[in-house]
């Protein structure tokens, strides 16, 4: 298993945020990932509008996962309307 950092930007509405967080946690658990750390980075003003939103709520996850799971996450996260942007970065050991 490899170490990854994932940053997700959610729409700042609280009901969408709670629903999105539960979806992401379920997605990680269903694919056999271990969430090492979850950190709320808070609501921030975006540098440019994303899907007509000027603010976003940032969450940082540190996970351990197999590389093929990252592609599955990519497909699933693209379909979620409450997630504005996301990025997975492999961390060095």
Segments predicted by a language model, with ranges:
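Long, contiguous binding/interaction regions
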Residues: 1-56, 64-93
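S-adenosyl-L-methionine
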Residues: 61
